[in-house]
C-alpha cells in the first residue's frame, strides 16, 4: 500500500485569534490580534505524517502592497470555521509542493498582495489549479 498524500484546506473566520509566530512589522512573536477579514490556507501531508502549512499574506499588513508566502498559519490561527481534507496522488502532491515553493508555476504573483484580487483566497484557488 502506498503513501496517503493529502492536502487540508482551512478557513479562519473574521475575528479569529492570530498568534504571531515571528516578529513582523510592529508585532512581536507571541502577540495576539483578531483577524480583520478571516483567512484561507492549506496544509500538505507527505504521507509519512510530515505536514507543511502554506498561506499567502500581506508582508506589511496592508490591503495593497508586497505579498509573501507564510508557513505559520496552521499554528498561528486559533480557530477555523471550515476544513476539508482531499487525498492526492503522488503526482498531485508533487505539483502542489512545487507550486507552494514557486506559485508562479500557475501564474500566481506572490510578490504583490491585493485584498481584492491577489489575496489568500486567490492563492488557495491557484493551488487547486496546480493539482488539476
Go through each PLM region and give its residues.
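Active-site nucleophile-His-acid catalytic modules used for acyl/amide transfer and hydrolysis
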Residues: 72-132
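Glycine-rich catalytic cores of cysteine/serine-nucleophile enzymes that process amide/ester linkages
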Residues: 2-85
